[in-house]
Amino acid sequence: MNRMLLPAAVIAAFLAQPVLAHEDDAAAGSGQGQFGKVNFPTSCSAAVQPQFERAVAMLHSFFFPEHIKAFQAVIKADPGCAMAYWGLAISQRGNPLVPPWPEESLKRALEAIQQGKAVAKTERERDWLNALEAVYRDYDKVPTSTRSQRYEQAMAELARKYPDDKEASIFYALALLEAVDHADKTYARQLKAGGILEPIDKQQPAHPGLAHYIIHTYDFEPLAERGVAAADKYAKVAPSAPHAQHMPSHIYSILGRWEDSIRSNTAAVKASRDYAAKNAPGTTFSQEPHAQDFMAYAYLQLGQDREARRVTGELGAIAKYSGARSYGRDTGAIAPASRYVLERAAWSEAATLAVPPDLYTYAEAIPRFTRAVGAAKTGNPGMAKGEIERLQALSKSAENSYWAEQVQVLVLAASAWRAQAEGRKDDALKLMRGAADLEDSTEKHVSMENRLYPMREMLGDLLLELGQPAAALQAYEASLHVAQNRLHGFYGAAKAAQAAGDRGKARAYFEKLAALAKNADTDRAELREAKAFLLAQR
């Protein structure tokens, strides 16, 4: 085959690849929208270079499937643009931080890489394609985690070989984040990524990938303050990307900045709906549920239960999606209904919560856990046992060891409430401590951004029930250190302090609760109790 030319049939095959959305690529190819500024030199024709860089900018904001359309448009205009095939290949993982991905997408990625190599004009472009191949090669035999580490090493070498190629450094930082070990409490890869990204961000403040990946880098409680500046600017850098509107709330949610989280996700939902209305009328864009989950969680912390209920109703009414299915879509669509009953301690509702079919493992585990706790809390440990058995089966069949462990956290906590319902108090406490310790030993996953419920806070609830208020207060305070500004966390700490005879702390926590829920839209019992306590202290 001529290295500079591809048969027309091959080019047509790539241009015909499915993108899981409406096939009108006018928006992708016309230059509409604002996605930030990227400088990525290639050997492609001068005519398509701006189009290619715009496609990369969209890629940096995970605007799937639009970035696929954009790279296809570049190939159509310049079939010899090797890096457009690289773009098409890397785009097959809509969000590279959230596996798994369909095997047919991984296969298409490898095919695109080979076609890119066939037309590559420079050693640098071949090196880019070879590095990317590391994450796709043997996808049907080698686990994702192994391939991610392989890709991390390949991108490290690329960045070392081309120190002036800032995109190589940026994608190396993203490769580090793809390979993060969620049990590593030293945050070694995250800190390394931050050290790469932050200096470049000062040089290229309008680059969408820098703000985006800095947020992901510091999307962990001990690091979150470092991500505030990136969070505050990202939506302005890429205002046309729905994901860019949502991402700041990753930092805001960790820090308990609920109004800011709601603001970000309101914009993200609007952007998602505008996109769906234009590109796939009658569908819900697949990125919307993740944003809605953040929004529901934030509303519940503010005592705005009606707004949270509105969100759960909208999610329950979704009939058809556009865009790719993902772990984040499933958990985002499912979690708010469970949050709505768990945060309100609506145990009868929890016990009867529906379990939709055809979900990723942890997404199915969410309502199963909620039903188990609801059953135990309403005096039906037999039903709780059945749901716990289903959770155990889910843990065994999970997509990988991380999700198996996260489901096991739910197994332990649900088993604790079942033991409590059966009067086995020592067992209950041991199981709940196990759940809290296991959860604390790992980090949350980007596709389940806000943990379903802080298990150390739940340990506080159990200790309070068992008449151990001092220990309960310790548990609540430890939980609030990690899960900041939570309404029930403040309430539990206030009740525990009150029961332990520490009226000063009780007052402080009730004051925090009252301030947090000052704009509550329902008459929460916790808020009534806080107001009554504070009134009596005057």
Language-model segment annotations:
Residues M58, Q92, A134, L176, ...:
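Residue at a conserved register position within TPR or TPR-like alpha-solenoid repeats
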Residues F52, M83-G87, I170, H212-Y213, ...:
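Alpha-solenoid helical repeat scaffolds
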Residues K76, A159-K161, D201-Q203, K233-S240, ...:
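Solenoid-like repeat scaffolds
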Residues A82, A89, R93, W101-A118, ...:
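TPR/TPR-like (Sel1-like) alpha-helical repeat modules
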Residues A46-R54, A82-N95, A120-D140, D164-H182, ...:
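Amphipathic alpha-helical repeat scaffolds of TPR domains
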